[in-house]
Each structure stands twice: as structure tokens, then as C-alpha cells.
């Protein structure tokens, strides 16, 4: 599913304030000098590239999962269009408190860090999954390239036990090394496409690459959910369904999944550091361990249906972690912290 931009709900009210930095544009719009589309193009644009960790989906029956995968938008730690409470205190809601902007949600269920042109399996095709290369391609095709790009993808790439030969299941070291290196190479290839295009823009572009989530603490919460289900089978009714999609989530394979995720995060960190020396002056590229260090050890952070994806509270934890490391990116784009906490907007 291709991304559909979401504009801040109160953006006209915000920029109608004479103190707003976008007020001159608002006057031009009100006087009929520019269209609403042209006015919106002047607002900061924030994009999210990712997998199901960045969406509000969860797994249940095949057809229900299929329907949610195709229709679920704006219900995650990045973007939530529901009122709060009881909605999610998403990154977008936090940003909306101090600047109007346009959110571009590219993330989707089942997305992989892939080799461009790689054929997808049947399951991903019917879900219309957009892998990393496809999501990057979507952004490159936009008429208004984003100012801020958040990237959190690769969680489906650490399913090391999937189709693993028996010998590698018992001695997985070479497989883990091979998978982490392959992910880095594919990730770097797509980052080069993204950065090359960003360098041609006439505005600053900040890219923030998040490490994979803290799987060690995540599985602590998952183990609690499993015990609860043992005591009451009505809890987490689709908890075991997880294993149909991610073999490595089985208890016997988790420790090496945790190892692989850490290896991947080190590869991503190194890749970002090595790329920084080659950037154009209008680009900032950073690695963040905010999600990799977030405490996900409570069962209530898991969705009550599948015990796999995040619950509303889980999305709140991820949102807070992700937002906490945005400061340097926002400052690069001209957003500064005000005297009383939060941030204030400067020109993009």
C-alpha cells in the first residue's frame, strides 16, 4: 500500500496566528495568491519507513489480518489520528503540539530490508507489502521530498531459524554472521538511493535510523504473556499464531534472535558512521539506539490478541523512546527547544 500524506488536523489554526513562522504563507493562501496544496507543501514533511513494529496491526485469523494489513493506518507510535486519551500519544501528536506538519506513513506489515527487485512471497504479495526498497522508491517519487525521515525496519530480517538447515540450527554462528552482513549491504544500498536524492533537494533533510527494538526485554514480556495464557486460554488467543510467521520467536531460537538483532544494530551503527563523511551539507544522518534500549519487559505492552505486536500502551512506550532522540534532528531542521520544555519551530 502506497503512503497517503496526513496533514496536522489544526494546521490552519496554527499558521493563522501572526506569531507563526508560516503566517506569511497563510496570508498568501487567504488572499488567493497560492492554493491550499501549495500552502501545505510549505509545511515540514515527516516520513516513516518501517515494518509492522511501526504500525497498529496485529495478527488474528487470516482474513482479519489481511483486512487490517490493507486498511490499518494512523494507529501507531509514529502516527495516531485518534483523539487522546484513549488514543496513542504518538510522535506525530507530540510534534503537532509545536509545529504544523505533514506525516507520510510508508511502513507496512511484513516489510523486509530487501535487495531491490527481489521477488516477494505469496503472503507478502496479497498483503501488498512494500519492502524497504519499495518504501524508499515511494519517497523518491513524491513531489515534495520529506524534511525528516525516520527509519525503523529489519525486524523481519532477524528470523534466522526460518528455512535454516538442521546443522545451522544447531551451530548458527555462520548463519547469523551471513544474515547480519546481508542486511547491512541491502540497507546501505537503499540508504544510498535515499541520501543521493536528499542531496538534490533545496532544503535540509534529516534522516534518523533507529536500531531494532530491545528484543531481550521484549521476550521477557512475551514470557509473562505465555504464562498468563497457560493459566487462562482466553488470554492472547492468537499468541501461538506468531510461530506461523516468525519461526525464531519459538523459545528454543530466541537467544540467537536476540544475538542477531544486536549484531544488526552494530552493523547499522557502523554503516551510519561511515556514511556521515560523504554527506552533502544539507543532510544530517544519525543512528539512534532509543528503541534498542527501551524497556519492553511488561506483558501489558503486548497486544491482547496476539501477544506479539504492541498494545496501545506499548505504542506509547515506543513513541516516547523514539521522540526522546529527535532533538538533534529537529534542531538541524531549525526547530529549537523553548524555555519551558518541548520545542519551538524555526523556518524549515
Put a short name on every predicted segment:
Residues 219-286, 312:
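Substrate-gating cap/lid alpha-helix
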Residues 263-270, 274, 283, 288-334:
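Extracellular low-complexity, Gly/Ser/Thr-rich intrinsically disordered linkers
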Residues 49-63, 211-235:
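Short, solvent-exposed beta-strand-terminating loops
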Residues 64-192:
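Conserved SGNH/GDSL esterase-like catalytic core that processes O-acyl groups on lipids
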Residues 1-102, 145, 329-348:
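N-terminal secretory targeting modules
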Residues 100, 198-205:
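A short helix->loop->beta-strand "cap" motif at the edges of active sites that frequently abuts
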Residues 45-57, 102-107, 147-152, 157-159, ...:
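Structural recognition of the beta-strand scaffold that forms the well-ordered cores
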Residues 55-57, 112-115, 157-161, 215-221, ...:
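Short catalytic/ligand-binding loop motif for oxyanion handling, primarily in non-cytosolic enzymes
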Amino acid at each position: 500500500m502506497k503512503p497517503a500524506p496526513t496533514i496536522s488536523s489544526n494546521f490552519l489554526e496554527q499558521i493563522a496566528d501572526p506569531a507563526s513562522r508560516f503566517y506569511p504563507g497563510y496570508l498568501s493562501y487567504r488572499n488567493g495568491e497560492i492554493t491550499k496544496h501549495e500552502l501545505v507543501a510549505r509545511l515540514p514533511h515527516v516520513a516513516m519507513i518501517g515494518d509492522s513494529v511501526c504500525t497498529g496491526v496485529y495478527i488474528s485469523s487470516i482474513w482479519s489480518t489481511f483486512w487490517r494489513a490493507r486498511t490499518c493506518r494512523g494507529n501507531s507510535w509514529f502516527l495516531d489520528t485518534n483523539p487522546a486519551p484513549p488514543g496513542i500519544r504518538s510522535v506525530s501528536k507530540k510534534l503537532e503540539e509545536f509545529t504544523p506538519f505533514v506525516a507520510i506513513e510508508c511502513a507496512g506489515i511484513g516489510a523486509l530490508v530487501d535487495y531491490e527487485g527481489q521477488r516477494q512471497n505469496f503472503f507478502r504479495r496479497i498483503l501488498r507489502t512494500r519492502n524497504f526498497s519499495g518504501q524508499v522508491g515511494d519517497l523518491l517519487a513524491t513531489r515534495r521530498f520529506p524534511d525528516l525521515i525516520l527509519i525503523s525496519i529489519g525486524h523481519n530480517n532477524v528470523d534466522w531459524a526460518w528455512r535454516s538447515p538442521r546443522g545451522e540450527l544447531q551451530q548458527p554462528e555462520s548463519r547469523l554472521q551471513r544474515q547480519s552482513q546481508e542486511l547491512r549491504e541491502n540497507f546501505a544500498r537503499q540508504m544510498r538511493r535515499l541520501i543521493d536524492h536528499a542531496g538534490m533537494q533545496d532544503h535540509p533533510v534529516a534522516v534518523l535510523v533507529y536500531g531494532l527494538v530491545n528484543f531481550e526485554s521484549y521476550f521477557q514480556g512475551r514470557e509473562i504473556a505465555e504464562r498468563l495464557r497457560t493459566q487462562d486460554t482466553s488470554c492472547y488467543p492468537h499468541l501461538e499464531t506468531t510461530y506461523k510467521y516468525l519461526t525464531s520467536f519459538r523459545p528454543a531460537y530466541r537467544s540467537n534472535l536476540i544475538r542477531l538483532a544486536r549484531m544488526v544494530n552494530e552493523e547499522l551503527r557502523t554503516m551510519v558512521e561511515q556514511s556521515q563523511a560523504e554527506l552533502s551539507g544539507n543532510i544530517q544522518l544519525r543512528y539512534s539506539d532509543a528503541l534498542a534500549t527501551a524497556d519492553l519487559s511488561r506483558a501489558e505492552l503486548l497486544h491482547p490478541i496476539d501477544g506479539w505486536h504492541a498494545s496501545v500502551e506499548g505504542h506509547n512506550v515506543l513513541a516516547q523512546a523514539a521522540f526522546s532522540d529527535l532533538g538533534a534532528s529537529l534542531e538541524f531542521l531549525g526547530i529549537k527547544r523553548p524555555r519551558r520544555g518541548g520545542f519551538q519551530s524555526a523556518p524549515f
